[in-house]
Regions:
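Auxiliary Fe-S-binding modules of radical SAM enzymes
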Residues: 1-24, 229-292
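Short, charged beta->alpha transition segments
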Residues: 55-59, 69-72, 103-108
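Canonical Radical SAM [4Fe-4S] cluster-binding loop centered on the CxxxCxxC motif
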Residues: 63-99, 151
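Conserved AdoMet/S-adenosylmethionine-binding subsite of the radical SAM
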Residues: 103-113, 117, 123-271
Length: 292
C-alpha cells in the first residue's frame, strides 16, 4: 500500500520488534496492507476528531472537553505506530514551536478558569530536548488553576532510555505532572521499560497507561490479563483500554465490540481493581470517553 504514514522506528523499537511478533505488528505494515472498506468508519477520514478544524482553538491548542486542553508540542515520535489516530495528520498538524505561540496557548487557558488539566501531546513531547520539555511543563504548571499537567509519551515503551534521572527530577518539581503512556502487550514491559517507569514513580510522578485493543496483539483474555499484570507489577496504573479510533487505514486492527466486552469481563473476573482499566471508545462528538 502506498502510504503517507511511513514506517519508522528508533533502534530500541526495532530491536524489540525483532523478538516480539506482537510489537512488530505495531511497527511494520503487512505486505498485504490496504485501507479498510468499512464506509461507517472511512467517512471519518484522517481527522475524525476535527483537530485541524473545530477542535482547534488557537494555534497548536485543541479543546474537546470543558476542563482540559491538548497542546501539540511535536510532530515526531520514536516510532510511527501503525494504529496511530493522527497518522493522517503527519506534516499537517499545527505544532507549538515559538515563544509567542506558547504564550498564546497559556493566555487561552488563563482566560478559561474551568480548565484544570493540560495534555502535552503530539507527536511525542519527549522527542524534544529536556529544556524544551520543561518550557511547556513550567508554562502551564505555573498557572494556579492548573492541577494536572499530563506528559503524553510512549517513550517508556518505544525508547525508554530517553527517561533519565535528570528529566525525572525536573518533571517532579511542580508536583503537578502525570505521565500518560501506552503499552499494548506484555513483551513491551522490558527491564529497560520498567526502569524508566521506576525513575518517574520514585520521584512521585504517577504513571498511567492507555492501551489500545488491537487484533493480533492483545485481543484475547489471556494476552490482556498478562499485559495488565505486567503493568501493575511495574507500578503503572492501567486506566483505559481503547477501541481503535474511527480513522482510515487501521481496519486490520479493529476488534468487534462483543469480543472486547468478553475480554473485559474475563479480566474483571481474574484481577483486582488496581489492575483493571476501563474499556472505552473515543467517539467523535461525544462528551466523554464512552464505556463499551
Amino acid at each position: 500500500m502506498k502510504t503517507d504514514f511511513p514506517e519508522y522506528a528508533c533502534d530500541y523499537s526495532r530491536r524489540l520488534a525483532s523478538v516480539s511478533a506482537a510489537f512488530a505488528k505495531q511497527v511494520y505494515d503487512p505486505k498485504s496492507s490496504r485501507r479498510g472498506a468499512d464506509d461507517e468508519i472511512e467517512k471519518y477520514g484522517v481527522d475524525p476528531f476535527g483537530e485541524l478544524t473545530h477542535a482547534s482553538k488557537c494555534f497548536g491548542l485543541k479543546q474537546r472537553f470543558k476542563d482540559r486542553v491538548l497542546i501539540m508540542t511535536s510532530d515526531r515520535c520514536f516510532m510511527n505506530c501503525r494504529h496511530c489516530t493522527r497518522r493522517g495528520l503527519l506534516g499537517k498538524a499545527q505544532v507549538v514551536r515559538t515563544r509567542s505561540q506558547l504564550d498564546a496557548c497559556v493566555d487561552y487557558v488563563r482566560a478559561r478558569p474551568e480548565v484544570r488539566d493540560v495534555l502535552l501531546s503530539g507527536g511525542d513531547i519527549l522527542t524534544l530536548g529536556d529544556k524544551e520539555v520543561m518550557r511547556f511543563v513550567d508554562a502551564f504548571a505555573a498557572l494556579e488553576q492548573i492541577e494536572i499537567v499530563r506528559v503524553c509519551t510512549r517513550a517508556l515503551c518505544t525508547n525508554p532510555g530517553r527517561v533519565t534521572d535528570r528529566l525525572a527530577k525536573a518533571l517532579s518539581k511542580s508536583g503537578k505532572v502525570w505521565v500518560n503512556t501506552q503499552f499494548n502487550c506484555a513483551d513491551e514491559l522490558t527491564a529497560e521499560a520498567r526502569e524508566a517507569a521506576a525513575k518517574l514513580i520514585n520521584r512521585g510522578i504517577p504513571v498511567s497507561c492507555q492501551s489500545v485493543l488491537l487484533k493480533g496483539v492483545n485481543d484475547s483474555a489471556p494476552k490482556m490479563i498478562k499485559l495488565l499484570k505486567a503493568l501493575s507489577s511495574a507500578r503503572i496504573r492501567p486506566y483505559y483500554v481503547f477501541m481503535c479510533d474511527p480513522v482510515a487505514g487501521i481496519g486490520r486492527f479493529r476488534v468487534p465490540v462483543e469480543k472486547a466486552r468478553e475480554i473485559e469481563r474475563r479480566a474483571a473476573e481474574s484481577l483486582g481493581g488496581l489492575s483493571l482499566p476501563r474499556f472505552v471508545a473515543d467517539i467523535p462528538g461525544a462528551r466523554r470517553k464512552t464505556p463499551i
